[in-house]
């Protein structure tokens, strides 16, 4: 998901900014369990001005707000994020309007294995064929909701398999399905001679399959059917 930063300097003058509020906290105990959280609020009071054609606004305040809470321990992590964007900031796509819990996960680790169930972000290699991330200021959040398994058989070798649906605003039923596998090998971690010489050598391989259903694009008086491949594979 993305939006175009459409607030030009002239248009920005028609808005009274609410000071951005962002607070983070960390609470830890002697039992090895820690809690991390944050709250963020960005808002504007829109003012209508016919001279610069700001248009009409249905609400007295426009804002995006987020609240995160994560529990971290030796073997199990869990967390969730609540978003309230009922009246999103100008420049964000209308489909952003809404609220809910778009990110919730549980992660377990044991003897080289790491299993995640829920929403997560991942990047294979340089991110050429798979990169999911969140950038709130740009309106980007393409997280994957599903499962991911990581395995490190030896130091320097990392294997990953995953599958799930990609976030599309607030409707996961219309989201595309993503499946993938990745292998990364850090040669210098396997070779003492390379480490002694200060050399670094990494090799990797990735495979991603994306599945999307057919789409009907409705136009006045016509019905266009978009013919695209349902399954698109990629290698890197």
Which residues does each predicted region cover?
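Bacterial N-terminal signal peptides
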Residues: 8-19
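Signal peptide processing junction and immediate N-terminal pro/mature segment
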Residues: 21-24
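A short acidic, glycine/proline-enriched capping/turn motif at secondary-structure boundaries
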Residues: 87, 113, 122-124
